[in-house]
A protein has these predicted regions:
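Cell-wall polysaccharide-cleaving catalytic domain and substrate-binding groove, primarily
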Residues: 1-217, 221-230, 236-259
Length: 259
């Protein structure tokens, strides 16, 4: 039974990790863990030369990679003991962000008995984590897409584990896609309103700016503060809209595959 759970989850992990890459600018592709240090061997099925300098990465088979994933991630996070769907999310967190974080998310959500709420909660934690990374502006879309696809796949597993018929599962996934789409539209509208307000505040702060000897006037400070806060709010709403769009797309895709 446990082997079956692992086998069900791995196609989703392999889909996200991809095949063989040998980008010399990626530190993970070097056996020394830094660009130019050691031998450039690359990454295959997500198994990197940095973590496994002893391997012939290029000739690694998917079956061999699966064995490594089972020991280093699946077993390390005790995924066999987790509910269907929850196991996939914890596994993907461990693979993409480290075993320590995978265990942390697993333990933090352990009190949540509802498997779907646990899947959603961990997925939200992932988005918040990625949003805080300095490289989010470059890789954010990729990360949010991955989180959404794993969340949607995990949701289907949860529903299937509840012995719901395919038609009911499809309907639930479609409903979630519609809900996420509506959430994206709402966040987009809110961002537009907040952006307009921030722009108005900026215009007002310039037009009402006092003489140079009064530059520290409280009114100027408050107006500038309003502009800064408005900009932060807009950025957060744009992030929310993007996350909802990715999730809507992922749910729609999984629903289309459900018959």
């Amino acid at each position: 039974m446990t082997s079956g759970k692992f086998d069900v989850c791995m196609p989703f992990i392999f889909r996200e990790e991809g095949g063989f890459t040998k980008d010399r600018h990626d530190a993970g592709n070097w056996t020394g863990g830094k660009v130019g240090k050691g031998v450039l061997k690359g990454t295959n099925f997500g198994i990197a030369a940095k973590a496994h300098p002893e391997l012939d990465v290029a000739s690694l088979t998917q079956a061999e990679a699966a064995k490594l994933y089972r020991v280093e991630y699946w077993n390390a996070c005790n995924c066999d003991l987790l509910a269907s769907g929850v196991d996939l999310v914890v596994m993907d967190v461990a693979v993409n962000s480290g075993v320590r974080r995978g265990r942390s998310y697993r333990d933090a959500t352990a009190p949540i008995r509802d498997a779907q709420k646990r899947v959603d909660g961990m997925s939200d934690k992932r988005r918040a984590f990625y949003k805080g990374l300095k490289t989010f502006s470059r890789y954010g879309k990729v990360w949010l897409g991955r989180v959404a696809r794993i969340q949607a796949a995990a949701t289907k597993m949860v529903l299937a584990g509840a012995d719901k018929p395919a038609a009911a599962i499809k309907a639930e996934l479609q409903a979630r896609a519609a809900q996420a789409h509506a959430g994206a539209a709402k966040a987009k509208r809110q961002a537009a309103v907040a952006g307009a307000g921030s722009g108005a505040a900026a215009t007002a702060s310039v037009s009402t700016m006092p003489a140079p000897d009064q530059a520290a006037h409280p009114t100027v400070f408050l107006m500038l503060l309003a502009v800064v806060v408005g900009g932060i709010v807009v950025a957060l709403l744009i992030h929310r809209a993007r996350a909802h769009r990715e999730l809507a797309s992922a749910y729609a895709e999984v629903a289309a595959e459900t018959n």
